């Protein structure tokens, strides 16, 4: 690239069409004075010679010396069938609409079966991730009723799913308002007072406790509105 930011190929195009530009300009000026070439006025010949040269220079600058396709020009050409790129079949499967997911056509079980991952638990890392159960304790509402985030059927299904990926002993499961840890694990579990102060009502808490870690512990709270139990979600 030249210091003046002009492609050498563009400069070559300008040099080649400069002859047409000069003669086109001369014929245009002469035609404005009323001169003719036989029965043909020069005012009609000048622009016919000059305009193709200007178009060639503009095209050379857009394509950087005819080396690449214009970025934002001739968009209608890209819409032709010959320019369309076929989408990957796996990408189309993953980009299903929410209606297909709700109908079960693109469920997580189906995708896992296609990927060959069904029944194979993921490798456990050194820092085990503790998944806390939802708060099942009654939460009084304005009407004086009690509500729970997860129904019994969904909760049992979720528990079986978590047991398959997190075997017993590899994770700590507890309620945010009730400590259910044994004596040996009590040092790793937070106190009920801390959870009551920070955990929103009727929410899900996902905490990570890694032994001998300089980052201590951290928790992630999921709002009730954002919770979706119809499909698995990896946090």
Swiss-Prot record:
Top-rank lineage group of the source organism: Eukaryota
Chain intervals with Polar residues compositional bias: 125-140
Alphabetically ordered keywords of this record: Membrane, Transmembrane, Transmembrane helix
Location in or out of the cell: Membrane
Organism of origin: Homo sapiens (Human)
Region (Disordered) location: 99-145
Protein name: Transmembrane protein 215
GO BP annotations, alphabetical order: negative regulation of retinal cell programmed cell death; sprouting angiogenesis
